[in-house]
């Protein structure tokens, strides 16, 4: 049995599952519920291939590069395209995930102010106080150190997944098929909704940062066989991810009237808030919903924040060097944390719509790195020509459609 499936492969499957299923899962039903049943069914059909193909392509891109053992995406880009384009891709990578950090911080603030609004009047001073508290507490957890923070995040993965599964099963008793069958019209508006839903799907199923670590680990352990090992794990992990996420999405949308989903979308909160808005929602659901939403988004925030701060530190170092100033890494890192935290606080106070940020900025930028860069490279780099497949071509087209939302959506 060990030859068929090892303990190590099981652990990596859990790692991929834990990073893919989280805060993004809470936003997907909001967009799909607003878009209509046709878009939901199309998403269900394409979820697995459009999760597997792009992440597989990124693995191929990393593993095919002739870089030193510990280098991931950045090293592969530099190997194929040189330092200048490598710096541009690194900057895009930083911006894409900095926006993810902002989305989670805004959504956490909104979830907390939504609960406070039941007891007190929310004005700009209250929002600023909550925003400051959110940024401060998340930074305090972050400053505990990578090891301690990752241990806390790892501990939270299974309770969160168990809650999603429990809630999906619990809501079966409230299913109303008419909520979906009443939205089955297909027209030009439906096509538009399919188009603008692509970035939210990309955002919800993407877990780009861990792919670099995953590919490096497989290469260190299996050498030339690394890609085969990656595909073996990814096929199984992504099937489980897609089935569980889609079960959660369908269960929510079969239970929640569209009006509540639209209210949650406008307020920039998650599907758990939409559930708690319903007049017949039990007290335990309202309480657990806000706790789980905040914990899930905090986990995802911190998981992304490490990479954002590392990227910001490098950008600060480079900028200071260009003006003739050389500071220690500790100084550059501290300045980066202050700058990122300050911008995050301001954005939380401004309160842009979370879904709009996903389909206008974050989703398209992630698509550039995950969908377009590795697949387009198979047409630009002769060494990657063997990886040209129908799946990679479809991934490239979907990536271009996703990016087009940023400019025309």
Regions found by a protein language model. Name each.
Residues 1-33, 51-56, 392-403:
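Membrane-interface "cap" regions at the ends of multi-pass membrane proteins
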Residues 7, 29-63, 67, 85:
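Extracellular loop-to-transmembrane helix junctions
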Residues 7-30, 93, 97, 167-177, ...:
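Hydrophobic, membrane-embedded alpha-helices of multi-pass small-molecule transporters
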Residues 45-55, 101, 160-170, 232-259, ...:
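Selective recognition of specific alpha-helical transmembrane segments in multi-pass small-molecule
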Residues 54-62, 70-120, 290-315:
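Hydrophobic transmembrane alpha-helices that form the core helical bundles
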Residues 70-83, 241-297:
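TM-loop-TM module centered on a large, flexible mid-protein loop between adjacent transmembrane helices
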Residues 105, 139-142, 158-186, 202-208, ...:
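Hydrophobic alpha-helical segments and their helix-loop junctions in multi-pass secondary transporters
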Residues 108, 112, 128, 132-174, ...:
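Membrane-interface loop-to-helix entry segments
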């Amino acid at each position: 049995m060990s030859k068929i499936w090892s303990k190590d492969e099981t652990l990596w499957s859990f790692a991929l599952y834990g990073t893919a299923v989280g805060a993004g899962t809470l936003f997907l039903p909001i967009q799909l519920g607003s878009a209509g049943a046709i878009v939901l069914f199309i998403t269900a059909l394409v979820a697995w291939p459009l999760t597997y193909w792009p992440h597989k392509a990124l693995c191929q891109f990393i593993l095919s590069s002739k870089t030193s053992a510990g280098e991931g995406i950045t090293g592969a880009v530099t190997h194929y395209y040189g330092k200048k384009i490598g710096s541009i891709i690194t900057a895009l990578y930083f911006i894409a995930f900095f926006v993810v950090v902002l989305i989670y911080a805004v959504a956490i603030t909104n979830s907390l102010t939504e609960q406070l609004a039941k007891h007190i009047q929310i004005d700009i001073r209250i929002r600023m106080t909550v925003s400051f508290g959110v940024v401060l507490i998340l930074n305090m957890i972050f400053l505990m150190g990578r090891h301690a923070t990752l241990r806390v995040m790892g501990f939270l993965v299974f309770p969160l997944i168990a809650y999603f599964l429990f809630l999906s099963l619990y809501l079966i008793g409230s299913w109303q098929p008419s909520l979906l069958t009443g939205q089955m019209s297909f027209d030009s508006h439906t096509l538009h909704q399919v188009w603008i839903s692509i970035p939210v799907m990309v955002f919800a199923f993407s877990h780009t940062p861990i792919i670099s670590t995953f590919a490096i680990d497989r290469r260190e352990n299996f050498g030339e066989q690394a890609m085969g090992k990656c595909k073996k794990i990814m096929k199984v992990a992504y099937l489980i991810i897609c089935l569980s996420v889609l079960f959660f999405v369908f269960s929510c949308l079969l239970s929640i009237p569209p009006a509540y989903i639209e209210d949650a979308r406008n307020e920039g909160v998650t599907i758990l808030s939409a559930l708690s808005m319903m007049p017949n929602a039990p007290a335990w659901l309202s309480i657990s919903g806000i706790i789980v939403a905040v914990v899930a988004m905090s986990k995802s925030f911190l998981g992304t924040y490490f990479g954002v701060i590392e990227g910001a530190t490098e950008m600060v170092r480079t900028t200071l060097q260009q003006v003739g100033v050389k500071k220690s890494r500790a100084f550059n890192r501290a300045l980066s944390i202050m700058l990122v935290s300050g911008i995050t606080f301001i954005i939380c106070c401004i309160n842009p719509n979370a879904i709009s940020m996903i389909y206008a900025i974050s989703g398209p930028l992630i698509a550039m790195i995950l969908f377009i860069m590795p697949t387009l490279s198979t047409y630009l780099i002769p060494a990657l020509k063997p990886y040209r497949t129908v799946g990679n071509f479809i991934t490239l087209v979907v990536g271009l459609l996703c990016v087009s939302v940023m400019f025309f959506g």
